[in-house]
């Protein structure tokens, strides 16, 4: 039992020693690299950490809004960052020149310190990424001449070009051609019925002639 306790105490002591060593190493790195210190102070993101990017010195508005932003965020925890920025910009415009002057002096002091600390610093604005053009899009000339085969009702193939007017016209012609014999038969029947009705309206002699011309009917 004592052997188990001694091993646990020994393991805990080793972990405590490693933690102390890591803290000592990190503190040495902090004091020996001023560039990384400035980067950590300005809260650089992970993308710029490999390049040790130096940020610009704060201007008068940034100096003033540093404390004001924290105050507004505490008073309005539900307000978004964009809304806070709009409100701070409006409040900054409402200040007089006398009220802004201390922040301009502080910004000038910070710029002087920045020049001494980074004499080779040059402002390099980030370029906005251009949207990539897709090669799948067809030019206007080729898209206007697009022609493809489409099946309507699985029995009327027609050609589609620029609009559906030709297809609709050809489809209507097919329907008219298919129904044309029925229409012709109906028209012939109407003509025969009209001729019979007009002939029966004539004289009694004509009616007798038509009746005698008909074959006799014998019921079965």
From Swiss-Prot:
GO terms for biological process: cell differentiation; male sex determination; sex differentiation. The keyword GTP-binding does not apply. SMART domains: HMG (SM00398). One of its GO terms (molecular function) is DNA-binding transcription activator activity, RNA polymerase II-specific. Residues 194-220 are annotated as: Disordered. It is found in: Nucleus speckle; Cytoplasm; Nucleus. Pfam families: HMG_box. Keywords: Activator, Calmodulin-binding, Cytoplasm, Differentiation, DNA-binding, Nucleus, Repressor, Sexual differentiation, Transcription, Transcription regulation. GO terms for cellular component: cytoplasm; nuclear speck; nucleus. Residues 54-122 bind DNA. Belongs to the SRY family. Interacts with CALM, EP300, HDAC3, KPNB1, ZNF208 isoform KRAB-O, PARP1, SLC9A3R2 and WT1. The interaction with EP300 modulates its DNA-binding activity. The interaction with KPNB1 is sensitive to dissociation by Ran in the GTP-bound form. Interaction with PARP1 impaired its DNA-binding activity. Transcriptional regulator that controls a genetic switch in male development. It is necessary and sufficient for initiating male sex determination by directing the development of supporting cell precursors (pre-Sertoli cells) as Sertoli rather than granulosa cells. Involved in different aspects of gene regulation including promoter activation or repression. Binds to the DNA consensus sequence 5'-[AT]AACAA[AT]-3'. SRY HMG box recognizes DNA by partial intercalation in the minor groove and promotes DNA bending. Also involved in pre-mRNA splicing. This is Sex-determining region Y protein. It comes from Zalophus californianus (California sealion). The lineage of its organism: Eukaryota, Metazoa, Chordata, Craniata, Vertebrata.
């Amino acid at each position: 039992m004592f052997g188990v306790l001694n091993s646990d105490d020994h393991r805990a002591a080793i972990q405590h020693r490693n933690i102390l060593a890591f803290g000592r190493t990190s503190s040495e790195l902090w004091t020996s690299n001023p560039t990384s210190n400035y980067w950590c102070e300005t809260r650089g993101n992970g993308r710029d950490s490999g390049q040790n990017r130096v940020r610009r010195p704060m201007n008068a508005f940034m100096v003033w809004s540093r404390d004001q932003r924290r105050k507004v965020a505490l008073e309005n925890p539900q307000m978004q960052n964009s809304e806070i920025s709009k409100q701070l910009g409006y409040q900054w415009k409402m200040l007089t020149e006398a009220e802004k002057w201390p922040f301009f002096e502080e910004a000038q002091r910070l710029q002087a310190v920045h020049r001494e600390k980074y004499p080779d610093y040059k402002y390099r604005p980030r370029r906005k990424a251009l949207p990539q053009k897709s090669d799948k899009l067809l030019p206007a000339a080729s898209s206007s001449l697009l022609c493809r085969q489409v099946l309507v009702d699985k029995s009327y193939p027609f050609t589609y070009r620029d609009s559906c007017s030709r297809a609709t016209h050809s489809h209507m012609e097919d329907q008219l051609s298919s129904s044309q014999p029925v229409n012709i038969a109906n028209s012939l029947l109407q003509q025969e019925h009209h001729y019979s009705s007009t002939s029966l309206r004539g004289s009694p002699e004509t009616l007798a002639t038509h009746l005698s011309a008909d074959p006799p009917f014998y019921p079965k």
